Amino acid sequence: MGINNPIPRSLKSETKKAAKVLRSFVKPNQVFGADQVIPPYVLKRAKGLAIITVLKAGFLFSGRAGSGVIVARLKDGTWSAPSAIAMAGAGAGGMVGVELTDFVFILNSEEAVRSFSEFGTITLGGNVSVSAGPLGRSAEAAASASTGGVSAVFAYSKSKGLFAGVSVEGSAILERREANRKFYGDNCTSKMILSGRVKVPPAADPLLRILESRAFNFTRHDHDDNASGDDFYDDGQYSDNTSHYYDDIPDSFDSTDESSTRPNTRSSRRRGMSLGSRSRYDDDYDDDGYGRGRGYGDFDSEDEDYDYGRSPNRNSSRNRGPQIDRGTKPRANTRWEDDLYDRDTEYSRPNHSGRDYDNTRGNRRGYGRERGYSLGHGPTHPSNMSNVDDLSHKMSKTGLGNESTATNSATPTAVALYNFAGEQPGDLAFKKGDVITILKKSDSQNDWWTGRTNGKEGIFPANYVRVS
């Protein structure tokens, strides 16, 4: 287990730290099997999550303090932007020493989320009940019971790589209002953030990739599709029978390999900002600089780039198919592992020649006719084509790409990396893992190809598949 920094830092750093911590709690590995991580049944029912790293120290009297983020699941199933939080508590006893612990708190009730949203604080064991979160086979029954009011919050903790029964009763989770104002704008509050009125920033991508994974959207159909037939936990062992449920959670967020790509999802397409938004998340000025007057009223519709220097335009990247995170080289001799989170991430600057998203209307369709892909970020949907034949005809006339028609002697195939439901007539819908016979393709995977699967033919985004 790496050392995570409990000292409050910028929301950008806290969000990346939270993604790393949450991944270690929800994705099995060779050490922790599927019955030793937070079960999908619990994650699916979660109304919110608080992810915190806490430092506990004491001599006669003990105290605990830490920092992290909180997110809420919205009514449409998407996730809110992260809100910065801190944790504080005190106790009495004979403890002598120091302990560093990562916590994931599962908020099972909307009341727990609402309590924090309204007042900016919740007291564990006070205004909300808390209990140790269930693991393994007892999880489904416990998660079902939680909806009946048994416990508003499930607590999971890990210290030095082991789950530990660390008591947190009496501890308070508090809003870090200054950090939120610094990041989002002068008048931003946790209520606005957790209600979905603030758009999700690019810095939250690693965290959203976990929140939108299969583990948080587990269904009984997924359980029934298990290779073992009916045993999801497989006697507590991590095996091929259960590992595929978690293969959409990356092992690292600094990788540029295939696992770091992420298709657009509901939260990544959500633009629901009823108040407008501060478009430049300036994460570099002083903590007390939030009173300088750049708030929600200063949204600039003509320039939506963030102040992260090399961060992408949100309208050009988060709404378009799989993206590649290009991490920078690690710094040497870092004392805290959290120092890694302050590094900028390399992105290619998107093409601003066209405005392909109407921010005032908040269009949420993944492949809408008004929002094609920008060059270099994925294929542009041929929105004016009524069927596949029209597509072939127009591509042959305009010479788009160097197409090659599949022959009977060597028909290429591809395996779907992501689900694609299709957005327009003529699209080829498929599920992750489906084998697609490629009928027509170009030399680039940032394009739309023609294929056949499950007895149907149509066009599909080539960067959603891996050519066999």
From Swiss-Prot:
Keywords assigned by UniProt, alphabetized: Cytoplasm, Cytoskeleton, Phosphoprotein, SH3 domain
Protein encoded by which gene: YSC84
Protein name according to UniProt: Protein YSC84
Gene3D superfamilies for the chain: SH3 Domains (2.30.30.40)
Domain of life: Eukaryota
GO cellular component: actin cortical patch; cytosol
InterPro entries, sorted: SH3-like_dom_sf (IPR036028), SH3_domain (IPR001452), SH3_domain_YSC84-like (IPR051702), SYLF_SH3YL1-like (IPR033643), Ysc84_actin-binding (IPR007461)
Assigned protein family: Belongs to the SH3YL1 family.
Record PROSITE patterns: SH3
Induction conditions: Induced during sporulation.
Annotated SUPFAM superfamilies: SH3-domain (SSF50044)
Transmembrane segment boundaries: none
Residue ranges of domain SH3 in the record: 409-468
Organism whose genome encodes this protein: Saccharomyces cerevisiae (strain ATCC 204508 / S288c) (Baker's yeast)
UniProt key word Methyltransferase: no
Signal peptide segment: none
One GO process term, biological-process aspect: endocytosis
Biased composition (Basic and acidic residues): 334-372
